[in-house]
């Protein structure tokens, strides 16, 4: 009995230890999420448009200048991981009922998280969004190779490949390949696309990202109507 009680006690402690990181992560981002909500109360963003979520690549993205003809909402919070966007999906996605959600996350996971786990976290994000918004399209921007994390490039590419395969199984999902777009003649990341930290993008880097993403955001033009037959041809 004593041994059993000890085992139960240890199990309880382990469960508590596992629960702490999730709560700590929620607390870590609470100020950022609360700031979004406060801004919404002052000026409510439009519904049914495009929401961008994810880490600092999203946060630093000047969406208004990148897509002046589109209505976009930036809900990026720097340093976040894929699981964080899922954790707050009811506060940073669902309230806006977007037609498209653009996701960039995984840069901060890749150092310590297996590629397979990043894919699982993205799948959870998709399920969380579609549970409330089944018609919303989700566009995942592939994790970009970077100078800072070039040593992890194989893990980046594995995660991207698996997420692409997942997206190909659902018409509501899309995948943007960033790999070739940021590499130079030597097949390494082009230095001019990254700021001094070797991770975040320069304005030129964002120009490339804009060009990659835009085709997925702009509705396809309606097919032209067939010309009416002239009286001479009747």
Regions found by a protein language model. Name each.
Residues 147-234:
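Catalytic His-Asp segment of secreted/periplasmic serine-dependent ester chemistry enzymes
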Residues 25-124, 147-157, 161:
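Conserved SGNH/GDSL esterase-like catalytic core that processes O-acyl groups on lipids
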Residues 119-141, 158-173:
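Charged, glycine-enriched surface loops/patches
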Residues 74, 140, 175-177:
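A structural preference for short, hydrophobic beta-strand core positions in alpha/beta folds
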Residues 20, 69, 135, 169-172, ...:
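Short, well-ordered coil loops that connect the C-terminus of an alpha-helix to the N-terminus
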Residues 76-78, 102-111, 123, 130, ...:
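Cell-envelope and extracellular/periplasmic
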Residues 1-51, 63-66, 218-234:
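N-terminal secretory targeting modules
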